[in-house]
Structures are given as structure tokens and as C-alpha cells.
């Protein structure tokens, strides 16, 4: 029943929003629609206010990085309609330079979600009232959830006893990076326990 409802919702949104939507997909019991970047405000306002939709709650905003694509980033909006008991995912695609319109005017709760997405991926949001980092430290370099961000990071912070403060310095690996792709010496051994010998002895009788 839920799948039929989502199929009907997808058709309804396509009818009402037309070319503002680039595509839609239904998979694993979830509906995802992809909006044109310049139409995201109109799309979200419609699905928030339309009586058949009423997606009034924004649960999360997140980014996804696909480095091989020209538009390498997806911005994903997770929405909830308590009235219809439905969830909906809305996506837009962008690159490192083109900002995504902030949706804070549509969903005030999106402010910190957009800050987190900016902090982790470097995705810009135009019209955001306070677009600054929210999770990483002051002076942090780069955006840690990008696929091209090094595992070790660029700098490390530590407390310096001489300076009596926290300092930042280039990462120094205490040992060479190693590839641990080998069979563990604790795997595959054929250990025979005393109880096994006893059971085998009873079976032989």
C-alpha cells in the first residue's frame, strides 16, 4: 500500500512541478526526486504547502561526493509529512563553485544542517544567514568528507607544554602508512580442544 502511495505521489509531483524536476526514482520503499538547482526553493515550497503533500518537517540535509562527475556533489533533503505519514528525499546537484540556494526561508530548521554540509563538503549555500563551520575547529583546512581529503588530514593539534597552549603543526606519522591486507595469524588455525578429543573418543566406541 505504501509503495502504491509513493508511485501516485511521484506522478502527482511530476504533473504539478513539470520541468522543475529532472528525475524521480522509487527504490527500497523510498521516493527520491531530483530538482533543478535553480528551482529548489519552488519545489520545496510546493511540497510543504500542497494539501496532498504537506511535507512540513525537514529531518536532515546531507551531502554526497562523486568526484568523477562534473557536478560532483548531491545535496539531499530528507523530509517528513506527519499528515500523510510519508517520507520524501529531494536532491539537487552542484559543483565546488556554484552555490545552492539556502532553504532556510522555507524550513528554518535547515540553518544548522546547511552549515554542517558546508563544513564537511565545502558546498556553498547562497542566502544563508550565517554560513560558517559548525563541527570542525577554528582554522581547519579542507572539508573532511570529500573523497579527495587525506585520511591523515593536513595538520594535527596538540597541547604544547612549553607554549602552554594548543598548537597546530603539519601531520607527522609516527610510523609509515601500512597496508594491513593479510590473513590474521589468529584466523584459520585448526585448534583441537580437549572436549573435542573426548567427543571423538566416545564416538569411536
Swiss-Prot record:
It comes from the Bacteria. Its EC number is 7.1.1.-. It is a peripheral membrane protein. It catalyses: a quinone + NADH + 5 H(+)(in) = a quinol + NAD(+) + 4 H(+)(out). GO terms for molecular function: NADH dehydrogenase (ubiquinone) activity; NADH:ubiquinone reductase (non-electrogenic) activity; quinone binding. Pfam families: Complex1_30kDa. It is found in: Cell inner membrane. Keywords: Cell inner membrane, Cell membrane, Membrane, NAD, Quinone, Translocase, Transport, Ubiquinone. GO terms for cellular component: plasma membrane. NDH-1 shuttles electrons from NADH, via FMN and iron-sulfur (Fe-S) centers, to quinones in the respiratory chain. The immediate electron acceptor for the enzyme in this species is believed to be ubiquinone. Couples the redox reaction to proton translocation (for every two electrons transferred, four hydrogen ions are translocated across the cytoplasmic membrane), and thus conserves the redox energy in a proton gradient. Belongs to the complex I 30 kDa subunit family. This is NADH-quinone oxidoreductase subunit C. It comes from Bartonella bacilliformis (strain ATCC 35685 / KC583 / Herrer 020/F12,63). The gene is nuoC.
Amino acid at each position: 500500500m505504501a509503495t502504491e502511495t509513493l508511485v501516485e505521489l511521484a506522478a502527482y509531483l511530476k504533473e504539478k512541478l513539470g520541468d522543475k524536476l529532472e528525475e524521480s526514482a522509487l527504490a527500497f520503499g523510498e521516493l527520491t526526486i531530483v530538482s533543478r538547482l535553480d528551482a529548489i526553493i519552488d519545489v520545496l515550497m510546493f511540497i510543504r504547502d500542497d494539501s496532498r503533500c504537506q511535507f512540513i518537517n525537514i529531518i536532515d540535509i546531507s551531502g554526497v561526493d562523486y568526484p568523477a562527475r562534473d557536478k560532483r556533489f548531491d545535496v539531499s533533503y530528507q523530509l517528513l509529512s506527519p499528515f500523510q505519514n510519508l517520507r520524501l528525499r529531494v536532491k539537487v546537484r552542484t559543483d565546488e563553485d556554484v552555490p545552492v540556494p539556502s532553504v532556510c526561508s522555507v524550513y528554518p530548521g535547515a540553518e544548522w544542517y546547511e552549515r554542517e554540509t558546508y563544513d564537511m563538503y565545502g558546498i556553498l549555500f547562497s542566502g544563508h544567514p550565517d554560513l560558517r563551520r559548525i563541527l570542525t575547529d577554528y582554522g581547519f583546512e579542507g572539508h573532511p568528507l570529500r573523497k579527495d581529503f587525506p585520511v591523515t588530514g593536513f595538520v594535527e593539534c596538540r597541547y604544547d607544554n612549553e607554549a602552554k597552549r594548543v598548537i597546530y603543526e603539519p601531520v607527522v606519522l609516527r610510523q609509515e602508512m601500512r597496508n594491513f591486507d593479510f590473513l590474521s595469524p589468529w584466523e584459520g588455525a585448526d585448534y583441537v580442544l580437549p572436549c573435542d578429543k573426548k567427543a571423538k573418543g566416545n564416538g569411536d566406541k
